[in-house]
Regions:
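Extracellular, repeat-based ectodomains that mediate carbohydrate processing or recognition
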Residues: 1-192
């Protein structure tokens, strides 16, 4: 549903955007729980080259292969139509990508993402930051965890990672596990 008056009234029409493979429950080996929770944001800076764009980011699990992926779609017409979903990360059958979060830098419209990348053949897990300077037309990604960690399938990590950005200062936050102990981390990213 949509509103043209800042939420005072809503149209009666609902629109299904995409089939959500895996839905809320995504099975990633060695993680107690993961989810495909969609993240929805808008670029609300009138000076941004992408002003008014709506962005959607979520994770899926392929029912046949069990592979997970982080997807992205955008609308440039107030949600009337949406781009076909694309992967934020490089295509790779050797990794699962999951537990994503996204933000838009209100000062310039740059998009930033954080998500886990876990080997499909081992417990080895890293944290990845991805960014887009062109409204999601393309993405750059970088592993930001200083070293890989190995999760335990018996310990609950939480349901979310998070990321904030303003004036090209980007701060993702995530939990990791070392020797059975969960700690919270961030990266100090100054984006140019």
């Amino acid at each position: 549903r949509s509103s043209a008056d800042r939420g005072q009234t809503w149209n009666a029409t609902e629109q299904m955007l995409f089939e959500h493979e895996g839905g809320w429950t995504i099975d990633v080996p060695d993680f107690y729980r993961s989810n495909g929770l969609p993240v929805f944001i808008s670029d609300h800076n009138a000076d941004s080259p992408h002003y008014g764009n709506l962005y959607l980011n979520w994770a899926i699990e392929d029912e046949e292969t069990g592979r997970t992926a982080v997807l992205f779609s955008k609308s440039e017409d107030d949600g009337e139509s949406w781009s076909l979903p694309v992967q934020v990360h490089k295509d790779s059958s050797q990794y699962n990508h999951f537990l994503t979060w996204m933000t838009v830098d209100p000062s310039n419209g740059n998009l930033h993402f954080v998500y886990y990348r876990k080997s499909r053949n081992a417990k080895t897990t890293d944290v990845v930051w991805a960014s887009s300077k062109n409204g999601g037309a393309s993405f750059n990604e970088e592993v930001i965890s200083e070293q890989s960690f190995e999760p335990s399938g018996t310990v609950f990590f939480g349901d979310y990672l998070n990321i904030a950005a303003v004036d090209n200062v980007v701060r993702p936050v995530w939990p990791r596990m070392d020797n059975g102990k969960i700690t919270l981390w961030t990266a100090l990213i100054n984006f140019e």
